[in-house]
Amino acid sequence: MALAYLLKNYTGRMIVDADGLTLLANMDKTLIKNTKAQLILTPHIKEFSRLTNRSTDEIIAAPVETARSYALEYGVTVLLKGPATVITDGDEVYITDAGCSGMATAGSGDVLSGILAAVCAYLPQEVEKQSGYNGHELAFSVAAGAYINGKAGELAQERNGSISMIASDTVSFTQEVIASLERA
């Protein structure tokens, strides 16, 4: 299986979403614990339920604690998608409510993964130059990517409406969000 091979051999950053999370939920957990890759998992509540073997009600009742516990146990960064998205590496916890109902459409997870890949390729190097992150640059970068994605989605919904919104609408507004952050 390709994912098992990557977990055993890959040493870079790896975003796992959708079907990859289903595969991860069904494989030997020691592969996750022993990987040299920097895993970024981006589940929604049901996917996280399968990963953790906890009920969706348990996760909804304590999303921060559940995500933090899993991240600590497996040495991964978790981005738990929901009305308030939780991002944690087990130590640092970030929460963003950026996003909107129009983003609940096919392809939105792919857009998020693309934004995360771009931000996580660039931002940790910039963050490392600043003090105060103490090895948590990846979690900060994932949180920044989630925020950019959510704000771009909000702009897309504001301008296009939620009913007709498609995933690529979010992409159309990422540059505007990034530019506004650079000006801030």
What are these regions (language model features)?
Residues 81, 133, 149:
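Adenosine-phosphate binding glycine-rich loop
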Residues 50, 105-130, 137-148:
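Short, small-residue alpha-helix embedded
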Residues 150-184:
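Charged C-terminal helix
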Residues 95-107:
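Short pre-catalytic strand/loop immediately N-terminal to key active-site residues, enriched for Gly-Thr
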Residues 65-69, 113-114, 118, 172:
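Feature representing long, continuous alpha-helical segments
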Residues 1-97, 182-183:
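Glycine-rich phosphate/dinucleotide-binding loop and adjoining beta-alpha-beta core of small-molecule
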